[in-house]
């Protein structure tokens, strides 16, 4: 597996992997491809170096987006905001998500962000178990439907 910085040429792969990864979790995802494309462009515009793709044999199987320009209302400073982390269902359980998270957190530290944040849907149980397995601590709940 190789993890590299994503760029605008990864748009179609991002859309494909995103849609497949969020199947069954549409309450937490964009459902129209046009919206997913705009979301990818927005992620790149926020922090182009923080968007990374995991590839196996040249095929995109997962993405992570770490935004080090994000101002946290909780921390009252810029943090490494993990906007996205997803892996194709057939590649889950192989450590790809953990490696993507590791790379995102390394990137945040390189940018002098000592705190990382993310939001996860309350009923996205697979993601919640994954983040718990990564020893991420759970802060106070915020918003409705997400933490």
UniProtKB/Swiss-Prot annotation:
> What family is it from?
Belongs to the acetyltransferase family.
Q: Which InterPro entries match?
A: Acyl_CoA_acyltransferase, Bact_Acetyltransf, GNAT_dom
Keyword annotations from UniProtKB, A to Z: Acyltransferase, Transferase
Residues annotated as domain N-acetyltransferase? 1-147
- Name of this protein: Uncharacterized N-acetyltransferase AF_0521
Superkingdom of origin: Archaea
E.C. number? 2.3.1.-
Enzyme kind, highest EC tier: transferase
Query: Which GO molecular function, any one, fits this protein according to its record?
Result: acyltransferase activity, transferring groups other than amino-acyl groups
Q: Which residues cross the membrane?
A: none
């Amino acid at each position: 597996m190789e993890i590299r910085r994503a760029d605008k040429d990864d748009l179609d792969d991002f859309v494909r992997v995103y849609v497949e990864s969020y199947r069954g979790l549409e309450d937490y995802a964009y459902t129209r491809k046009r919206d997913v494309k705009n979301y990818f462009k927005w992620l790149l515009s926020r922090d182009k170096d923080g968007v990374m793709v995991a590839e196996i044999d040249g095929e995109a199987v997962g993405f992570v987006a770490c935004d080090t320009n994000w101002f946290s209302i909780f921390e009252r400073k810029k943090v490494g905001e993990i906007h996205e982390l997803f892996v194709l269902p057939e590649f889950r359980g192989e450590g790809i998500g953990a490696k993507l998270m590791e790379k995102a957190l390394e990137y945040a530290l390189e940018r002098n962000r000592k705190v990382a944040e993310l939001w996860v849907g309350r009923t996205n149980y697979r993601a919640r178990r994954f983040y718990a397995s990564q020893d991420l601590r759970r802060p106070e709940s915020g918003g409705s439907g997400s933490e």
